[in-house]
Amino acid sequence: MTKQKFLHNLINVVAVFLFAVFLLFDGYTWGKFAFLAASLAIYVLGLWERNDKIVLRFDMYVVIYFVFIAYVLLTALWAKSAMSTITMARTLFRTFICAYIVYLYFVKEKDVSRLLRILMWAGYVVAIYSLMFYGVDELLKAGTDSSLRADNEFANVNSIAMCCALSCMIQANEFFEKRNRWTCVFLIPVLIVIGATQSRKALLFLIVGVFSAFIVKNQNESFVKKFGKIILGCVVAVLIIYGLLQLEIFSGIKQRMQTMFNSFTGNGKADGSSLTREKMIEIGWKEFTEHPVGGIGIANSYFITDKYLGIKTYLHNNFVELLSCGGVFAFIFYYAIYVYLFYNLWKYRNADKKQAMFFAIWLLIMLALDYGSVSYYSKVQNFYLMIHFVNIENLKRKARAKQIENNKICESGQKIHYKSLLSISD
């Protein structure tokens, strides 16, 4: 094994550890030092692997994030609790620095699929650790009834489930592309964990993500073939989903889905969690209408929930959280990230249609899930967005390479045409 190959594999291991440690050890004080150490290790090993020198990048990834973090800090001037806002700004800055260090290494990768496989393996590590932590029997029991849901003992169970669901989406993409099919065996612990956590968001992510991977696989087919395969895929997906929900381990999540629908329709037993979240959206929007420009200060939403609900927590909705705490400017500065990414995915879609489609669907799922969670300060979410920026740079390079190749073909064609004209005139 060459030095480059050894370092390449070692970086993969460190990166898997980094993405897994976000969830496994986020609650520990030393966690932030582990994040930084792993990030630096990836970059330093990368310099050694490529015989490279230290070069910093100042691109749109840096600009957009710095503008948002700077505005978060600015809201401390009028925040109800300036210290809470400053603490949040510090957390965002630390997370960005770790993500930026990793970005500097992976942005030079020719193929972004390496990063996706790292995420997939990180999800498998989290699932296996969860099985060892809770015990297989306990997790199997936890999925059988909504009252037995796994607790947030070492990490938030929704975050664990979402990480596992993303692994399923990436594994499905690998399967359809006929790569690493043997790793499908790790879907067993992943599905057990999703069932035990009873995360409705993770179940929806799993369903939409796997089906989307099927659509991406057929992206280069003709319209008729694509349409036919999508219809067939829909039928198969419905049958698989129905089959999964009949399993005892998914009984709890099925009950929670039913009570959630009841809370919207007003029929049957309603889900208290969904009703509370609806109330949070309502009071958050009310607070935004009273402070539309600058809000009440980032990370100050607990003042709102304490005032109206008697509990100190966040609003469980990223859109309302940003609007009520940071006003319209916080909303614009943060979601400028998504606007930039979607715009460039569309602009460079022809560089690699499958890659662009996969990331567009993933980004769309992330955006939709913001309706049920506060994600702007999540370490995992910020690293996911960093990967999307890496993907954009990768698509740009592919687009430039195609343009250069097309220019060469055009120049070659002109020369041939010129020579043929000479031969005729002679």
Task: Please name every model-derived segment.
Residues 140-146, 150-151, 266-326:
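Long extracytoplasmic/lumenal interhelical loops at the membrane interface
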Residues 117, 180-181, 215, 219, ...:
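Hydrophobic transmembrane alpha-helices and their immediate junctions
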Residues 1-49, 68-78, 366-368, 383, ...:
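N-terminal signal-anchor transmembrane segment
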Residues 2-10, 47-63, 174-185, 218-229, ...:
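Membrane-interface helix-loop-helix junctions at transmembrane boundaries of multi-pass membrane enzymes
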